[in-house]
């Protein structure tokens, strides 16, 4: 079997006047993430991991932040389009593991919703999708609450490989 592993990363600045959307879940908080789309840092990291595993570049290659078509885009729609593109290239997703690093707000109450959204968008059973939440122990820009970061790993199998 032809296994492929991809790694994804994203970070966005926290600002006032934007909703905070992570893993497709709108989280009550006084600030949200700045970005061209909805700035869903977790879904962007997962999308990058998937494109990377399939050697199809990255999220910016497919959904440019300079393209007006993606202004305010729902990252769940972008993730589903990513899945369609990697499936068309002959890959199937085996699992995704991810980590969100945020000093605040507390993300644990929202993890189940994030996992459910991601599993649905990837067409995977829930037990093949993991989301972890960590703080940065008050260190650096993440620890000061200036932004939120996400990392992801994905395993794909090339069909017929």
From Swiss-Prot:
Cofactor entry: a divalent metal cation
Source organism of the structure: Burkholderia lata (strain ATCC 17760 / DSM 23089 / LMG 22485 / NCIMB 9086 / R18194 / 383)
Classification via InterPro entries: MECDP_synthase (IPR003526), MECDP_synthase_CS (IPR020555), MECDP_synthase_sf (IPR036571)
Quaternary state and interactors: Homotrimer.
The UniProt record lists the keyword Metal-binding: yes
GO molecular function, one term: 2-C-methyl-D-erythritol 2,4-cyclodiphosphate synthase activity
Domain of life: Bacteria
CDD domains: MECDP_synthase
Binding residue positions for 4-CDP-2-C-methyl-D-erythritol 2-phosphate: 10-12, 36-37, 58-60, 63-67, 144
Catalysed conversion reaction: 4-CDP-2-C-methyl-D-erythritol 2-phosphate = 2-C-methyl-D-erythritol 2,4-cyclic diphosphate + CMP
Family: Belongs to the IspF family.
Gene responsible for this protein: ispF
Protein name: 2-C-methyl-D-erythritol 2,4-cyclodiphosphate synthase
Lineage: Bacteria, Pseudomonadati, Pseudomonadota, Betaproteobacteria, Burkholderiales
Pathway the protein takes part in: Isoprenoid biosynthesis; isopentenyl diphosphate biosynthesis via DXP pathway; isopentenyl diphosphate from 1-deoxy-D-xylulose 5-phosphate: step 4/6
EC number: 4.6.1.12
Keyword Hydrolase: no
Enzyme class: lyase
Cofactor remark from the record: Binds 1 divalent metal cation per subunit.
Pfam short name (any one): YgbB
């Amino acid at each position: 079997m032809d296994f492929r592993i991809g790694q994804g990363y994203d970070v966005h600045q926290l600002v006032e006047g934007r909703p905070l959307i992570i893993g497709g879940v709108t989280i009550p908080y006084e600030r949200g993430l700045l970005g061209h789309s909805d700035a869903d840092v977790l879904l962007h990291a997962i999308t990058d991991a998937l494109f990377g595993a399939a050697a199809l570049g990255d999220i910016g290659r497919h959904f440019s932040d300079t393209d007006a078509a993606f202004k305010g885009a729902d990252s769940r729609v972008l993730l589903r389009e990513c899945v369609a593109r990697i499936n068309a290239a002959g890959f199937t997703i085996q699992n995704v593991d991810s980590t969100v690093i945020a000093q605040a707000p507390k993300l644990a109450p929202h993890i189940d919703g994030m996992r459910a959204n991601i599993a649905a968008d990837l067409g995977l059973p829930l037990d093949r999708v993991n989301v972890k939440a960590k703080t940065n122990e008050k260190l650096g820009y993440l620890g000061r609450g200036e932004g939120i970061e996400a990392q992801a790993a994905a395993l794909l199998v090339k069909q017929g490989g």
